[in-house]
Curated annotation (Swiss-Prot):
It comes from Haloquadratum walsbyi (strain DSM 16790 / HBSQ001). GO terms for molecular function: ATP binding; glutaminase activity; phosphoribosylformylglycinamidine synthase activity. It is found in: Cytoplasm. Pathway: Purine metabolism; IMP biosynthesis via de novo pathway; 5-amino-1-(5-phospho-D-ribosyl)imidazole from N(2)-formyl-N(1)-(5-phospho-D-ribosyl)glycinamide: step 1/2. PROSITE patterns: GATASE_TYPE_1 (PS51273). InterPro entries: Class_I_gatase-like, PRibForGlyAmidine_synth_PurQ. The active site is at C88 (nucleophile), H205, E207. Gene3D superfamilies: 3.40.50.880. GO terms for biological process: 'de novo' IMP biosynthetic process. Keywords: ATP-binding, Cytoplasm, Glutamine amidotransferase, Hydrolase, Ligase, Nucleotide-binding, Purine biosynthesis. It comes from the Archaea. This is Phosphoribosylformylglycinamidine synthase subunit PurQ. One of its GO terms (cellular component) is cytoplasm.
Amino acid sequence: MTVVVVQFGGSNCDRDAVRALQHIGIDATRVWHEDGLNDSVENLDGIILPGGFSYGDYLRAGAMAAHSPIVNDIQAAAERGIPVLGVCNGAQVGCESGLTPGAFTTNDRARFQCETVHLRVENATTPWTEAYEAGTVIEIPIAHGEGRFEITENEYEMLKNDNQILFRYCDASGNITDDANPNGSRGNVAGITGNYDTVAVLMPHPERATLPELGRSTDGKGILQAFG
């Protein structure tokens, strides 16, 4: 059993994801998107769509990668209950391919944001958040230019009513404020689940908050443990 990290042209966080998973004792391997998943779905513990700049972010971030044939395999795997996580550019691919609602667009500050942010856990009942308690504040790095989550008012209300919001940007005390929102995301949303709670997308990078030598936080381990 293993976790597949999908490598698109322009991905640059696939090795990071593999290393982070291996660090917490989870077998992981990279798969080139043109090769597909083939028959390996039967032996999968999960799939990660990693960060980067797939296809140079032409058209829209994640838009071209969302049309890769492997996405059909990923959607089929999601329907079978296999965990799928989209991180940063992978989150954009997830939204563009319909794995989750909404879209990620240009930051309201119109610049690339690279910093460590605070996130408040909104729903601790999913595989991605069961390592935490609701209301817990964690620290995870971000690095994106198109991370502003947008969604229609009706869909946003559905996300809230269906408890699909995993994380919101907050301050160190857990307060949801405009100042704590690094990109202008609606409702300070940083991560959500899709039609299945085994499918999630988030802009922050949990793989960059897993190895202690990489920074001050290892809070990302709790998210990646969903694959264990």
